[in-house]
Amino acid sequence: MRKVLITGGSSGLGKRIAQIWSQKGHQCHIVGRNEFHLKETLQSLSVAKGQQHTLTIADVQSDMKNLKSIFESVEIDTVVHAAGVLQSSLCVRTSEKEIDSIICTNLVSAIKLSKMAILEWFRNKNSERDRLILNISSRLSTYALPGTSVYAASKAGLESFTKVLAAEVASKGIRVNAISPGYVDTPMLSSQIRAIAEKKVPIGRLASTDEIVDACTFLLDNRYTTGTILPITGGL
Protein backbone atom coordinates (compact mmCIF):
# COMPACT_ATOMS: atom_id res chain seq x y z
CA MET A 1 0.00 0.00 0.00
CA ARG A 2 1.35 3.38 -1.00
CA LYS A 3 0.65 6.47 1.09
CA VAL A 4 0.03 9.31 -1.31
CA LEU A 5 -0.24 13.06 -0.78
CA ILE A 6 -2.26 14.67 -3.58
CA THR A 7 -2.60 18.43 -3.98
CA GLY A 8 -5.57 19.63 -5.98
CA GLY A 9 -7.45 16.65 -4.63
CA SER A 10 -10.87 18.26 -4.46
CA SER A 11 -11.67 18.19 -8.19
CA GLY A 12 -10.54 17.28 -11.67
CA LEU A 13 -7.49 15.13 -12.19
CA GLY A 14 -6.33 15.18 -8.57
CA LYS A 15 -9.70 13.88 -7.43
CA ARG A 16 -9.76 11.14 -10.05
CA ILE A 17 -6.21 10.02 -9.20
CA ALA A 18 -7.28 9.65 -5.57
CA GLN A 19 -10.40 7.69 -6.51
CA ILE A 20 -8.67 5.24 -8.84
CA TRP A 21 -5.59 4.75 -6.69
CA SER A 22 -7.75 4.10 -3.63
CA GLN A 23 -9.48 1.38 -5.66
CA LYS A 24 -6.02 -0.12 -6.21
CA GLY A 25 -5.48 -0.24 -2.46
CA HIS A 26 -3.45 2.92 -1.92
CA GLN A 27 -4.03 5.34 0.96
CA CYS A 28 -4.68 8.92 -0.15
CA HIS A 29 -4.15 12.18 1.72
CA ILE A 30 -5.89 14.83 -0.33
CA VAL A 31 -5.20 18.55 -0.13
CA GLY A 32 -7.29 21.44 -1.44
CA ARG A 33 -8.92 24.75 -0.64
CA ASN A 34 -12.59 23.79 -0.85
CA GLU A 35 -13.74 21.90 2.24
CA PHE A 36 -17.06 20.80 0.74
CA HIS A 37 -15.45 19.31 -2.37
CA LEU A 38 -12.65 17.71 -0.36
CA LYS A 39 -15.19 15.97 1.86
CA GLU A 40 -17.08 14.88 -1.24
CA THR A 41 -13.88 13.39 -2.67
CA LEU A 42 -12.97 11.72 0.62
CA GLN A 43 -16.36 10.01 0.81
CA SER A 44 -15.88 8.64 -2.71
CA LEU A 45 -12.59 6.87 -1.94
CA SER A 46 -12.42 3.10 -1.55
CA VAL A 47 -11.50 1.73 1.87
CA ALA A 48 -11.67 -1.92 0.82
CA LYS A 49 -8.06 -2.52 1.92
CA GLY A 50 -8.46 -0.76 5.26
CA GLN A 51 -6.95 2.52 4.10
CA GLN A 52 -7.21 5.56 6.36
CA HIS A 53 -7.64 8.42 3.92
CA THR A 54 -7.50 12.02 5.16
CA LEU A 55 -8.17 15.51 3.90
CA THR A 56 -6.29 18.72 4.61
CA ILE A 57 -7.72 22.14 3.83
CA ALA A 58 -4.79 24.19 2.56
CA ASP A 59 -3.79 26.62 -0.16
CA VAL A 60 -0.54 25.39 -1.69
CA GLN A 61 0.45 29.00 -2.33
CA SER A 62 0.67 29.82 1.37
CA ASP A 63 -0.05 26.86 3.67
CA MET A 64 3.14 24.81 3.63
CA LYS A 65 2.91 24.35 7.41
CA ASN A 66 -0.35 22.44 6.99
CA LEU A 67 1.28 20.23 4.37
CA LYS A 68 4.25 19.56 6.63
CA SER A 69 1.87 18.26 9.30
CA ILE A 70 0.85 15.46 6.92
CA PHE A 71 4.44 14.23 6.67
CA GLU A 72 4.74 14.38 10.45
CA SER A 73 1.72 12.12 10.97
CA VAL A 74 1.95 9.74 7.99
CA GLU A 75 4.89 8.04 6.24
CA ILE A 76 4.13 9.53 2.84
CA ASP A 77 6.00 7.81 0.00
CA THR A 78 4.37 9.45 -3.01
CA VAL A 79 3.63 13.11 -3.73
CA VAL A 80 1.36 14.15 -6.59
CA HIS A 81 1.29 17.86 -7.40
CA ALA A 82 -2.02 18.23 -9.24
CA ALA A 83 -2.98 21.69 -7.96
CA GLY A 84 -3.07 24.15 -10.83
CA VAL A 85 -4.33 27.53 -12.00
CA LEU A 86 -5.16 28.07 -15.67
CA GLN A 87 -4.92 31.26 -17.73
CA SER A 88 -7.32 32.38 -20.45
CA SER A 89 -6.15 35.88 -21.38
CA LEU A 90 -3.26 37.44 -23.24
CA CYS A 91 -0.22 38.27 -21.14
CA VAL A 92 -0.82 42.03 -21.40
CA ARG A 93 -4.34 41.54 -20.03
CA THR A 94 -3.27 39.31 -17.16
CA SER A 95 -3.00 41.13 -13.85
CA GLU A 96 0.09 40.91 -11.68
CA LYS A 97 -2.01 39.15 -9.05
CA GLU A 98 -3.06 36.52 -11.59
CA ILE A 99 0.53 36.10 -12.78
CA ASP A 100 1.73 35.56 -9.21
CA SER A 101 -1.07 33.07 -8.56
CA ILE A 102 -0.33 31.03 -11.70
CA ILE A 103 3.43 30.88 -11.15
CA CYS A 104 3.15 30.23 -7.42
CA THR A 105 0.50 27.50 -7.66
CA ASN A 106 1.83 25.70 -10.72
CA LEU A 107 5.58 25.98 -10.13
CA VAL A 108 6.77 27.50 -6.86
CA SER A 109 4.51 25.37 -4.66
CA ALA A 110 5.69 22.23 -6.49
CA ILE A 111 9.30 23.17 -5.79
CA LYS A 112 8.61 23.85 -2.11
CA LEU A 113 6.56 20.69 -1.67
CA SER A 114 9.20 18.56 -3.40
CA LYS A 115 11.91 19.99 -1.15
CA MET A 116 9.77 19.30 1.91
CA ALA A 117 9.14 15.69 0.84
CA ILE A 118 12.78 15.00 0.02
CA LEU A 119 14.03 16.39 3.34
CA GLU A 120 11.51 14.20 5.18
CA TRP A 121 12.66 11.17 3.19
CA PHE A 122 16.31 11.95 3.91
CA ARG A 123 15.48 11.89 7.64
CA ASN A 124 13.96 8.44 7.22
CA LYS A 125 16.73 7.08 4.99
CA ASN A 126 16.41 3.52 6.31
CA SER A 127 12.98 3.07 4.74
CA GLU A 128 12.92 0.62 1.82
CA ARG A 129 9.83 2.22 0.31
CA ASP A 130 9.94 3.39 -3.30
CA ARG A 131 9.55 7.17 -3.22
CA LEU A 132 8.03 9.18 -6.03
CA ILE A 133 7.26 12.80 -6.85
CA LEU A 134 4.79 13.08 -9.72
CA ASN A 135 4.12 16.51 -11.22
CA ILE A 136 1.19 17.32 -13.48
CA SER A 137 2.46 19.43 -16.37
CA SER A 138 0.74 20.27 -19.66
CA ARG A 139 1.21 20.05 -23.42
CA LEU A 140 0.90 23.83 -23.33
CA SER A 141 4.42 23.97 -21.89
CA THR A 142 5.67 23.77 -25.48
CA TYR A 143 2.54 24.34 -27.61
CA ALA A 144 2.12 28.02 -28.49
CA LEU A 145 -1.53 28.78 -27.78
CA PRO A 146 -2.21 32.53 -27.45
CA GLY A 147 -3.73 33.41 -24.10
CA THR A 148 -1.74 30.84 -22.13
CA SER A 149 1.73 32.41 -22.02
CA VAL A 150 2.09 32.65 -18.24
CA TYR A 151 0.56 29.21 -17.71
CA ALA A 152 2.90 27.77 -20.37
CA ALA A 153 5.90 29.34 -18.66
CA SER A 154 4.90 27.81 -15.33
CA LYS A 155 4.56 24.35 -16.85
CA ALA A 156 7.78 24.60 -18.86
CA GLY A 157 9.53 25.49 -15.63
CA LEU A 158 7.88 22.55 -13.89
CA GLU A 159 9.16 20.14 -16.54
CA SER A 160 12.73 21.44 -16.30
CA PHE A 161 12.54 21.25 -12.52
CA THR A 162 11.30 17.66 -12.75
CA LYS A 163 14.18 16.53 -14.97
CA VAL A 164 16.94 18.21 -12.98
CA LEU A 165 15.54 17.22 -9.58
CA ALA A 166 15.33 13.61 -10.78
CA ALA A 167 19.05 13.71 -11.56
CA GLU A 168 19.79 15.22 -8.15
CA VAL A 169 18.02 12.57 -6.07
CA ALA A 170 18.12 9.39 -8.19
CA SER A 171 21.04 7.99 -6.19
CA LYS A 172 18.96 8.38 -3.03
CA GLY A 173 16.23 6.08 -4.33
CA ILE A 174 13.81 8.91 -5.07
CA ARG A 175 12.09 9.10 -8.46
CA VAL A 176 10.73 12.31 -10.01
CA ASN A 177 8.47 12.23 -13.06
CA ALA A 178 5.78 14.30 -14.73
CA ILE A 179 2.93 13.76 -17.12
CA SER A 180 2.22 16.25 -19.88
CA PRO A 181 -1.46 15.92 -20.81
CA GLY A 182 -3.10 17.53 -23.77
CA TYR A 183 -6.62 18.83 -23.35
CA VAL A 184 -8.43 16.98 -20.57
CA ASP A 185 -12.15 17.06 -19.89
CA THR A 186 -12.10 18.70 -16.43
CA PRO A 187 -13.98 21.64 -14.86
CA MET A 188 -10.73 23.64 -15.09
CA LEU A 189 -11.04 23.90 -18.89
CA SER A 190 -12.77 27.06 -20.09
CA SER A 191 -15.43 26.86 -22.81
CA GLN A 192 -13.19 28.93 -25.11
CA ILE A 193 -10.24 26.56 -24.84
CA ARG A 194 -12.55 23.53 -25.00
CA ALA A 195 -13.86 24.67 -28.39
CA ILE A 196 -10.32 25.21 -29.71
CA ALA A 197 -9.19 21.85 -28.38
CA GLU A 198 -11.86 19.82 -30.09
CA LYS A 199 -10.79 21.27 -33.45
CA LYS A 200 -7.02 21.04 -32.93
CA VAL A 201 -6.51 17.58 -31.42
CA PRO A 202 -5.81 15.04 -34.21
CA ILE A 203 -7.63 12.28 -32.37
CA GLY A 204 -10.72 14.51 -32.42
CA ARG A 205 -11.70 14.69 -28.76
CA LEU A 206 -10.61 15.64 -25.27
CA ALA A 207 -8.91 13.08 -23.04
CA SER A 208 -10.88 11.59 -20.17
CA THR A 209 -9.41 11.92 -16.72
CA ASP A 210 -9.21 8.11 -16.52
CA GLU A 211 -6.91 8.04 -19.56
CA ILE A 212 -4.58 10.50 -17.85
CA VAL A 213 -4.69 8.55 -14.59
CA ASP A 214 -3.60 5.44 -16.51
CA ALA A 215 -0.37 7.27 -17.40
CA CYS A 216 0.08 8.38 -13.79
CA THR A 217 -0.33 4.79 -12.65
CA PHE A 218 2.37 3.64 -15.07
CA LEU A 219 4.81 6.17 -13.60
CA LEU A 220 3.78 5.09 -10.11
CA ASP A 221 4.35 1.39 -10.76
CA ASN A 222 7.42 1.38 -13.01
CA ARG A 223 10.32 1.74 -10.61
CA TYR A 224 12.95 2.16 -13.32
CA THR A 225 11.37 5.34 -14.64
CA THR A 226 12.65 8.71 -13.45
CA GLY A 227 13.30 12.10 -15.04
CA THR A 228 10.54 11.33 -17.53
CA ILE A 229 7.99 13.78 -18.94
CA LEU A 230 5.29 11.50 -20.33
CA PRO A 231 3.08 13.10 -23.02
CA ILE A 232 -0.57 12.06 -23.32
CA THR A 233 -1.81 14.42 -26.01
CA GLY A 234 -4.04 12.72 -28.56
CA GLY A 235 -1.43 13.56 -31.20
CA LEU A 236 -1.27 17.30 -30.49
From Swiss-Prot:
It is found in: Mitochondrion. Keywords: Fatty acid biosynthesis, Fatty acid metabolism, Lipid biosynthesis, Lipid metabolism, Mitochondrion, NADP, Oxidoreductase. Its EC number is 1.1.1.100. Pathway: Lipid metabolism; fatty acid biosynthesis. CDD domains: SDR_c. Involved in biosynthesis of fatty acids in mitochondria. This is 3-oxoacyl-[acyl-carrier-protein] reductase. It comes from Schizosaccharomyces pombe (strain 972 / ATCC 24843) (Fission yeast). The gene is oar2.
